[in-house]
Each structure stands twice: as C-alpha cells, then as structure tokens.
C-alpha cells in the first residue's frame, strides 16, 4: 500500500498545474456522480455550486471558486478539460505557469461575480431563471481572450486560412452573445465575466502590470511540485547587450514568444 501511495505521488508530481486541475475536476465530478447515484436528486451539492442569491454567496464565499470544479454532465466536463489542456500547454510555452494559472483562477472568480451581480442588479424577467452556476468555462474563456488580446496581430493558420488572434477572439465573443438570451443565460454571463477578465489582464500585462500578483503566495505550492520556474538573481549594475537585466529578460522572452507563434502561424492546424 505504501509503495502504491508513493507511485501515485510520483506520478502526480510530474503533472503540470493544469493537468492537476484536470485531475481535480475529474475526481470531483466522479464524487458528485456517485453521490447523485446513491442519494438520487436529493444529493445536496449546494456547498460547492454558486447560487445567484447574494445572501447565500455571502454565507458561502468559497463557492465563487469551487463552482469551477463542478460540472453537470460528462460532456460539459470533457469539452472544458480538453480546451483547458491544450490552452494550458500553449500558455506554458509562452508564459510562466503561475501567469496562466492566475488568469484561469481569476477568470473563474470574475465569471462568478458577473453571474451573481447580473441576477441581483437586473430586474427579474430580463434574464431567464436559472439554478446554481457550475463549470470551468469562465476560466477557460479568460485564457483564450488573454492570449488573443496579448498578441492580437499574431496569425494562426486554420486549414488554408490565416487569421489574426484578435479576430478569433472577437468571433468567440460574438458567438456567445445569443447565449445571454437562452435558457443558459447564467452560464453565458459567467463567460463574459471571463472574457472581460482575460482582456483586462492582458492589456495590463502588456503595460508591465500583473493584476494577479496578489495570488503568488497562495499559488506557490502549485509550482513546488511542478516544473521549476526560472529564478532571477538580481545583481547590481549588470548589463546585457547594453540593456538592464530586466529589459534584456523582457526582450528575450518576447523573442521566444515570436519564434513559437511564427512556427504556429506557418504550420497551423489541419
């Protein structure tokens, strides 16, 4: 039994942060599935899902995050995790893991806030009546829009066509607008919360501001067991190619991003 536990720990330690999130989402889904099978529709999952009632959210503030780990069907879970997996890998190639993880988590929180605010600010009857909010879609969409806003003019090839990322982002947002008037209007509202967060994060990050910096300490344990991040040791008056260390690092990182995206733009997705 001890060797089995060690084997599981070793395998988990090799996963990146997004693979761990996928594992966590899958475990929670299986737990909820079993609970519903045993207790039927009487299974109470309100302590994890996000209510549209402001008073309930105030009494269970953790649900602003935990709702992102609950999914109401296998298809719902599957598509969110597939998108998260591929975009998580793309983010890991372009940015440090802590940046992509902060975008994802803040996207979930922003989507949750948007959902609760909309149903408490707009008069009843404007939005369709919905139950509790579940799903990681807001976090996933925040990641997509972050990438599109951070590198808007980079072109990605789809079959025989090439599109700038900014147009792909606009198309995704426009495609979600009809959902605001559907039976799943609550979910679409959360999506737009993720869109806004992703866009705002990217525009600030382009200016050198990391709006998710306050999460660094909270998320530090994710990076300990995943691939180590680069450590920068500050030295006084050091220069690299006539530039300060920070300027040189920024320049080099941008060049790496350009090289990766040039490869993506040339090879494309077919």
List PLM regions with ranges.
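A detector for small-residue-rich transmembrane helices and their helix-helix packing motifs
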Residues: 1-256, 260
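Structured cytosolic domains appended to multi-pass membrane proteins
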Residues: 256-270
């Amino acid at each position: 039994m001890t060797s089995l536990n060690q084997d599981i720990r070793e395998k988990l330690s090799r996963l990146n942060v997004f693979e761990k999130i996928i594992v966590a989402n899958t475990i929670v889904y299986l737990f909820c599935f079993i609970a519903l099978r045993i207790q039927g529709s009487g299974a109470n999952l309100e302590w994890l899902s996000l209510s549209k009632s402001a008073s309930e959210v105030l009494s269970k503030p953790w649900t602003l995050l935990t709702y992102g780990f609950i999914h109401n069907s296998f298809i719902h879970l599957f598509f969110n995790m597939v998108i998260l997996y591929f975009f998580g890998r793309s983010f890991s190639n372009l940015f440090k893991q802590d940046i992509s993880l902060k975008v994802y988590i803040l996207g979930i929180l922003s989507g949750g806030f948007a959902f609760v605010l909309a149903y408490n600010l707009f008069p009843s009857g404007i939005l369709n009546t919905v139950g509790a909010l579940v799903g990681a879609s807001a976090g996933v969409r925040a990641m997509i829009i972050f990438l599109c806003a951070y590198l808007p003019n980079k072109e990605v090839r789809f079959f025989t066509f090439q599109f700038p990322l900014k147009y792909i982002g606009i198309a995704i947002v426009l495609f979600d607008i009809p959902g605001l008037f559907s039976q799943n209007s609550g979910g679409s509202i959360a999506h737009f919360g993720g869109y806004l967060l992703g866009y705002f994060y990217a525009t600030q990050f382009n200016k050198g501001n990391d709006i998710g910096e306050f999460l660094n300490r909270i998320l530090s344990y994710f990076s300990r067991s995943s691939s180590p991040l680069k450590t920068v040791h500050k030295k006084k008056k050091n220069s690299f190619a006539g530039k300060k260390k920070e300027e040189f690092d920024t320049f080099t990182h941008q060049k790496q991003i350009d090289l990766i995206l040039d490869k993506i733009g040339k090879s494309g997705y077919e």
